[in-house]
Amino acid sequence: MNQDTQSANTQQEKKIAYNFNKLQKRLRRNVGNAIADFNMIEDGDKVMVCLSGGKDSYTLLDILLNLKLSAPIHFDIVAVNLDQKQPGFPEHILPEYLESIGVEYKIVEENTYGIVKEKIPEGKTTCSLCSRLRRGILYRTATELGATKIALGHHRDDMLETLFLNMFYGGKLKSMPPKLISDDGKQIVIRPLAYCKEKDIEKYSQAKQFPIIPCNLCGSQPNLQRQVVKEMLQTWDRQYPGRIETMFSAMQNITLSHLCDPSLFDFKGLKRGQVLDGVEGDIAFDKAEIPNQPLIQDEDEQTTDYGENGMIQFKQVQ
């Protein structure tokens, strides 16, 4: 190998390392901001990270472990995988990976695959039943492990897709919440990747070379409604760059007085002569003011205040 080739290889390696460092910092920042905005993790928490073997959950676990090293509070992490007994599932991959990184883990074996195949007719989607079964098992496991938070790997794109799924097929303005409490009040579920782009997660997963396990039960089903919505959003993103970011911002800027749900806003109670603080009234007749700024902002150039010493300020329990 001549000197010019060696120099070119060195420059390429430096560029790859630089880009990976930027990507990791962006994911750390987005996860840290989501944790802070929604008070997802507090001092003394035991976070159960649900690991499926897909790119999202691997990235979630990796970033949380990374943040844990510099967090100003103490919290524990335990990784949990639900082995659903799908035919051909490589049972050795996750235990070997988790042992290699030295994280506490538990593999839960439940034949939900057999139940789903028995209950759901051939050709029908299995997602709904499979999801309910998994949820019950994971809630039970969290209780057994003494986990105070259950972390799932859903990201920003998942939340947007769910919003449109519910509008198109369910007639509801509803998405995935970044944080929720179970119906019985015993479990808190968090989604620390809520601010993360799927594109970033995909790149990070490839760079880290996670041992990905495909979901043959879900991913192989044709004509899923979620896949239709995903492709629609991807098309919009190609045709109108920046629209995905704008739509996600809309989920964080909701004006209840300009929707049509009387259970959330007292339309009947509006009387002439009233002046309501914080409610847009005749502004509704004005032409919308669109800020004159680029649709896409380079996230690497954004400045975010992480508190003292550049660390994310997790809320501490008093």
UniProtKB/Swiss-Prot annotation:
Pfam families: ATP_bind_3. It is found in: Cytoplasm. A motif (PP-loop motif) lies at residues 52-57. It comes from the Bacteria. One of its GO terms (cellular component) is cytoplasm. The keyword Magnesium applies. Keywords: 4Fe-4S, ATP-binding, Cytoplasm, Iron, Iron-sulfur, Magnesium, Metal-binding, Nucleotide-binding, RNA-binding, Transferase, tRNA processing, tRNA-binding. It catalyses: cytidine(32) in tRNA + S-sulfanyl-L-cysteinyl-[cysteine desulfurase] + AH2 + ATP = 2-thiocytidine(32) in tRNA + L-cysteinyl-[cysteine desulfurase] + A + AMP + diphosphate + H(+). [4Fe-4S] cluster binds at C127, C130, C218. Catalyzes the ATP-dependent 2-thiolation of cytidine in position 32 of tRNA, to form 2-thiocytidine (s(2)C32). The sulfur atoms are provided by the cysteine/cysteine desulfurase (IscS) system. The thiolation reaction likely consists of two steps: a first activation step by ATP to form an adenylated intermediate of the target base of tRNA, and a second nucleophilic substitution step of the sulfur (S) atom supplied by the hydrosulfide attached to the Fe-S cluster. Homodimer. This is tRNA-cytidine(32) 2-sulfurtransferase. It comes from Actinobacillus pleuropneumoniae serotype 5b (strain L20). The gene is ttcA.
